[in-house]
Amino acid sequence: MGIKNLSTRLVLALGASSAAASLVPRQTNGSSPVTSPYFQDVSDYLDSIVDELWPINKEIHDNPELGYKEVKAHKLLTDFMESHEGWNVTRSIYNISTAFVAVFEGSGDGPIVSFNAEYDALPGLGHACGHNLIATASVGGALATAEIMRAEKLPGKVILFGTPAEESLGGKVKLHEAGAFRDHNIDISLITHPTNGADTPYMITTSTDRFEVEYRGKEAHAAAGPWEGINAQDALILANNAIALMRQQTRHTDKIHGIITSAGSRINVIPALAEASFQIRSADNVALEQWTERVMKCFEAGALATGAELNLTMRPYGYDNMVNNDLLASSYAKHFTEIGGKVPSAEIDKLRDPDGSTDQGNLSHDFPSISPYFGITNENGTAPAGGPHTAAFEVAAGSRAAFDKAIMAAKGIAGVAVDVLTVDGLLEQINEEFEATKEKRRKRRSVFQISR
């Protein structure tokens, strides 16, 4: 693929947000920020391989597999990457059978840009979070970046990680704790995500933890001698009611939701066991620590009031809030709008409240990262009737229209990666911003328990 002369194809980048205004990349021809001159080639290359990517996307969507069981998707993606010249693929990395890494080496030492592919589905809902589209965008973005690297003999590396089990099981967190991303010395981490809403370079998410709650009491006949029992169900209901009342004094970004999974089986027996699963979320890690302390007191109150024994365990692999890098987001916005996309201004966009959680957030605390949203539609152009994790979204995620939008997202993140590889001083500026704005991490506890 021929690449035109750099001086004839420099394009002005989207103005950086106010938070990053002093961190624009260094220039060689004027005062405005610049992006790489190769974006048209990125776009053309992705257009040339859509007939290869569509069957991959369709196969993953039509054969949903749960986290850590994505056997078909793992084989499909690794075989596909291995079929492309220059890619070195390693399967089942870090003792995770459905994880993989694919590496494309440039002409020497240089920036290392990475993409994450997700491909797990939801129980009972299939690909209602559109992870088939995420895989497609990341695979396409990685291939396009490598093609520019090959054609221009650029230094550096392109890395595609296959990251299973995003849906509550923390695949990226597990890989990160095992050293996958640090061992490969990545400089940036890129991914995208479909939505039923607007296109945006910024994913704004919550920090979250999950808890398994168990109250143990004492059985007794509910009519003949209820005073001899200790009602575990009452303890759980008291805790739940305390949490409900506490919501009046909480920030709107502090959220908790849960289900009772068991609480007795016979109506004439005082329940000796009650179990529940709860999830708490907050805007960032610091706020989550504060919110957690308040919620734990509610669970302890249930035990204190009834005499039941409380056993509470935090599940491993909690998710951190997403820390978006403004310069990466600015690069994505520039390229996405070049191909017809529309995004809000960064100043307005970042005012959105956080919603949902992702294990990409954990990576964003340790590496400059973005996870742009791209809005998808049904085949007829209408928005899905529901958002992610609904049956309507699963249908839309399988449409050709949604696939076409994923290709646009692939072009956007590939454009970002090529900018990092080719624009003088950009990576240094990205790292300066990252160090200046990185939010305080709390120490992640693999197991957190309360027994009362």
PLM region spans:
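Fungal secretory targeting signals
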Residues: 1-24
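Acidic/His- and Gly-rich active-site-bordering loop/insert found
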Residues: 2, 22-158
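Metal-dependent amide/peptide-bond hydrolase catalytic core
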Residues: 25-30, 34, 233, 237-452
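Sec/Tat-exported extracytoplasmic proteins
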Residues: 49-50, 57, 61-64, 85, ...
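Structural recognition of the beta-strand scaffold that forms the well-ordered cores
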Residues: 90, 112-116, 159-162, 188-191, ...
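Histidine/acidic-residue-rich, glycine-tolerant segments that coordinate divalent metal ions
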Residues: 98-104, 120-128, 132-133, 148-271, ...
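Acidic-glycine-rich active-site phosphate/pyrophosphate-binding loop
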Residues: 106-118, 203-214, 383-390
